[in-house]
């Protein structure tokens, strides 16, 4: 740019309108901080590698790693120096600006010169202001030259200060194809291990089969033969598990079938409503109450809560022989007749009143009557036999009586 062709108003206005040297000083500080961090990283890398390769870790691997990381450490050191140089150049550029700014004519001075010239020209009626006008123009030319010189110097110094060494990219310290190669090696090793495992198990099975079959031919080795068969079966199970496991080819082939099963279960949800209704409905009697299941509805209605509470009474029981029973038993029992009323020709005394209750607990009454009847057949010494008459034992002549109780129809 030709700064000499520009008036001082433009050159001075540009210098005073800019942000000044503040951004350059901030950039210099940032470059210095980056340089310090890079120097610290390089020192840390160097000390770590040196500590590993000197004592605890020695051998081909340590030498290879140290050789691989050495270019990176060198790049960090070089980059740190470049960052430091960039910071110094930024400081130089800031100084150059301050020098050019100080050499530039302030815009107010230029404005005052132009205002004075206009005033002298306006009042120069008779030519009396001609020397003053010439002096003012000469002063303005000096300011023009001063600003042009300052701008030329500033441009040259800034060009020198802005010359920086280009930064380089960090060197490649690893093999780009190592990841793919490592994955291929791992897959190959896994496949080889699986195939060798199956081959070894097949070889073991083939070697055990003849000895196991031979041991079965003798009875003396039955126990060892069974143990051999257990080993053979276990080997077969292991082989089948390896061939059909979830990570085998056969197991991977079953993955599409899982989606089919899932859709089948979703479609089967519509058939669950009848099953749920049957599950939530009334349950049939089971266990000891299962014989009573047909009675429900035909003979026995639904169970309903009792209408009232429990009641009790005192001295209201009736007697069946010598047994106290509730009054309801007598109401539900059929009438039983004594053998004397049925067979009047016999000499047996009635063992039970004519209107004695029976039915539900008739067996109890009969057992009591039978016991009393048998008591009547016992022979008593000196006093004769005991005779049962009307439910009581009385003295009678010695005799033997058989009591037969026949319930009423």
From Swiss-Prot:
One of its GO terms (biological process) is response to host immune response. GO terms for cellular component: cell surface. Keywords: Cell wall, Secreted, Virulence. It is found in: Secreted, Cell wall; Cell surface. InterPro entries: PPE_C, PPE_dom, PPE_sf. Virulence factor that modulates the production of host cytokines. Interacts with host Toll-like receptor 2 (TLR2). Belongs to the mycobacterial PPE family. This is PPE family protein PPE32. It comes from Mycobacterium tuberculosis (strain CDC 1551 / Oshkosh). The gene is PPE32.
